[in-house]
């Protein structure tokens, strides 16, 4: 079974979850979300894809998961992202991590995150939809 942690299930996070639910692979999705509205929206989007899918659980905080996570997606605002990354690096065992949107709010946090990822021998993938800017 594939174990996945999604931190933040707002608009983009819930779309990631929809894509995961579409996969035919057996999976369990751990979802960290504090907003009631986002939780309801995420459940609706899950059920729109597969009304029988129940292999997910919501948390208010990053959970301690005793199994290795195959994938972590951090889809929050950039402000708390470094703190979230530090918590994940100290409490979770994982294979792959995706950072959504603008990674961090400034270059200092970006460089600190880069250093932490290197120290922990982890590679982060950045999903940034604005790949080209025309001036």
Predicted regions and their residues:
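N-terminal Rossmann-like dinucleotide-binding module
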Residues: 1-51
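Short alpha-helical
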Residues: 11, 36-38, 79-80, 105, ...
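Hydrophobic packing residues within well-ordered alpha-helices of enzyme cores
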Residues: 16, 20, 39-43, 84-88, ...
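A short helix->loop->beta-strand "cap" motif at the edges of active sites that frequently abuts
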Residues: 26-27, 92-96, 119-123
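A short helix-to-beta-strand connector/capping loop
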Residues: 48-57, 119-123
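Beta-loop-alpha module in the N-terminal Rossmann-like domain of NAD(P)-dependent dehydrogenases
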Residues: 53-116
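A contiguous active-site-proximal alpha/beta segment in oxidoreductase catalytic domains
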Residues: 104-135
